[in-house]
Amino acid sequence: MVKRKANHVINGMNDAKSQGKGAGYIENDQLVLTEAERQNNKKRKTNQ
């Protein structure tokens, strides 16, 4: 899981209280998926 800096956080504020837990970072899970999992996701989306 890759974390990168978010651009919606206001400097000088209490991140945990005002902007949600873990504010300041974007977690990108898409890079972790294997090819088989991607294919399965496509099948699930078409079945919905």
Curated annotation (Swiss-Prot):
GO terms for cellular component: endospore-forming forespore. It is found in: Spore core. Keywords: Sporulation. The keyword Lipoprotein does not apply. GO terms for biological process: asexual sporulation; sporulation resulting in formation of a cellular spore. It comes from Bacillus subtilis (strain 168). Induction: Expressed only in the forespore compartment of sporulating cells. Expression is sigma G-dependent. This is Small, acid-soluble spore protein O. Pfam families: SspO. Residues 1-22 are annotated as: Disordered. It comes from the Bacteria. The gene is sspO. Belongs to the SspO family.
